[in-house]
Amino acid sequence: EPLAGFRHAKALEHRTKIDWAKQMKWLADEVYPNAEKIIMVCDNLNTHDKSSFYETFPPAEALRLAKRFEFHYTPKHGSWLDIAEIELSALSKQCLGKRRIDNLEDLNSELEKWHTDRNAMQKGVDWQFTTDDARIKLKHLYPIVTF
C-alpha cells in the first residue's frame, strides 16, 4: 500500500494460482477485514486473476473474494513498476544483502523482521504521476482525435 507505507513479504515454495489466492484471502480477511473494496495493482502474471479464487476455494468463498477485489494491471513500462522495483531494491539491500539463506523458514523470518521494521517507519511512496503528465510524457501512446 504505497501511500500508507504498508508492505508484506512472504516467500513460498511455489508461485501457483492457489498460493496467490490464499495470500489474497489472507489480505482480505486479516489485513483489510472491514474494507468493502480492495484495489490491487498487479503485474500480468497468469496467477494474478480472479479465476485463481475459483480454482482454490468453494464457489461461495471464491465469489465473496472476487467481489472484494478490484484488479488493475501494470503496463510493461510504467511508474507502478518503478514503485515495485524500489521496494525490491530496499528488500535486497536492507534484508537479503549478498548472503545465502538456506531455507524457506529462515527466509520468511528475515522477511518478517524487514517488513515489520519498514512498516513501522511508514516508508511510503507518494506517486505524483497524473493523467496530464502522462499525456505529455507518453504522448506517443495517446491518439489525436479530431472531429
Protein language model regions, located:
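Short functional hotspots at interaction and active-site rims
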Residues: 1-147
